[in-house]
Swiss-Prot record:
Superkingdom of the organism of origin: Bacteria
Species per Swiss-Prot/TrEMBL record: Xanthomonas oryzae pv. oryzae (strain KACC10331 / KXO85)
SUPFAM superfamilies on file: GAF domain-like, Winged helix' DNA-binding domain
Family: Belongs to the HrcA family.
Upper classification of the organism: Bacteria, Pseudomonadati, Pseudomonadota, Gammaproteobacteria, Lysobacterales
Pfam families in the record: HrcA (PF01628), HrcA_DNA-bdg (PF03444)
Gene3D superfamilies linked to this entry: 3.30.450.40, Heat-inducible transcription repressor hrca homolog, domain 3, Winged helix-like DNA-binding domain superfamily/Winged helix DNA-binding domain
Record keywords, A-Z: Repressor, Stress response, Transcription, Transcription regulation
Ranges that cross the membrane: none
Protein name: Heat-inducible transcription repressor HrcA
Length: 350
């Protein structure tokens, strides 16, 4: 639900709702009219507050646990809070310094992603998640081919960010070592510094225009590159801190927690959510059922895309209970995205 769909609330009601949700996030206990009368900063009686809370419950922003006279926010209530009531608390200078120092020590993209997810988990006390840039977006530095047997070839691919990938490919024909060396020399001389997708497209285009001996070399290059230069997706997402959720009171249902950990293990659902946010500027928040997945109805996901050299590379975020400190985590996620993007622009990373 977006802010434009929120019910119209007068200033007094907004202040009561803001105070109630902030107190509930802090304490984890249902909030009653007496507590609000003491802490909302309004000159109204508990009886008046009770009437307002009843109205907020009628429109679906609050609910009443059976065992308490107080009220707690619904997912709808959290959405209104996040969209229009929360008062942001940006990370302090020391937190920003920690982020920058940790990410500055990363050696290569995968190391940076791991550091970013660990820092997000440590600073949020929940799960940190970072989607990896697609390898198609990265420039390759060097390639070598080694014949393993009559049908299989080992492709050793070094990217500009110092990552190395070894891939076993099965080309259409057997190649002599001298042929493999010739193709590798050609690819390194012509395409070092180019993105993978550009290389494949360029090879096919040149093959259509080539003749005689050059045509044979290009045909061999296309044959080998068609498999060797296809991006691998084994490291498509990095997560850290999943076990932190085991100590969260709001996620104490073991069956639901087991479902959540199965989602973490498969990664597919989390990646789908991150993909939905990759082109959205700024922070995007999914609260409970907004994820569209039953197994994630008890959690919230706060995400932001990270960019380098003007290009969106991926998304990072925090996964935690719906009762999370949005005022602190929303700006933290945005800051982490900015810092990671800056680190990705450092020489030797891309």
């Amino acid at each position: 639900m977006r802010a434009s769909q929120s019910p119209m609330l007068d200033p007094r009601t907004r202040q009561l709702l803001r105070t109630l949700i902030a107190r509930y996030i802090r304490d984890g206990e249902p909030v009653g009219s007496k507590t609000l009368a003491q802490h909302a900063g309004l000159d109204v009686s508990p009886a008046t507050i009770r009437n307002i809370l009843a109205d907020l419950e009628d429109v679906g922003l609050l609910s009443s646990p059976h065992t308490s006279a107080g009220r707690v926010p619904t997912a709808h209530g959290y959405r209104v809070f996040v969209d229009s009531l929360v008062q942001m608390q940006p990370p302090g200078e020391e937190e920003v310094r920690r982020l920058r120092a940790e990410l500055a020590s990363g050696n290569g993209t995968q190391s940076l992603l791991g550091s970013a997810s660990q820092m997000l988990s440590a600073m949020s006390h929940f799960v940190g998640v970072v989607s990896a840039p697609r390898r198609e977006q990265f420039a390759f530095r060097h390639i070598d081919f080694v014949a393993l047997d009559a049908r299989r070839v080992l492709a050793i691919l070094v990217f500009a960010d110092n990552e190395v990938q070894n891939r076993v490919i099965e080309p259409r024909r057997a190649y002599e070592p001298a042929e493999l060396e010739r193709v590798a020399n050609y690819l390194n001389a012509q395409f070092a510094g180019r993105a993978l997708a550009d290389i494949r497209a360029c090879l096919l285009r040149e093959l259509r225009m080539a003749k005689n001996e050059m045509e044979q070399l290009l045909a061999h290059s296309v044959d080998l590159a068609s498999e060797a230069l296809v991006p691998a997706d084994a490291d498509d997402m990095v997560m850290a801190g999943q076990t932190r959720l085991m100590g969260v009171q709001d996620l104490s249902d073991l069956d639901r927690l087991r479902e959540l950990f199965e989602v973490f293990a498969s990664k597919r659902e989390i990646l789908q959510l991150l993909e939905r946010t990759i082109q959205a500027p700024g922070v995007r928040i999914f609260i409970g059922e907004e994820t569209g997945m039953v197994s994630l109805e008890d959690v919230s996901l706060v995400t932001a895309p990270y960019t380098a050299h003007g290009q969106v590379l991926g998304v990072l975020g925090v996964i935690g209970p719906k009762r999370m400190a949005y005022d602190r985590l929303i700006p933290l996620v945005q800051t982490a995205a900015d810092v990671l993007g800056a680190a990705m622009e450092s020489p030797g990373t891309r």
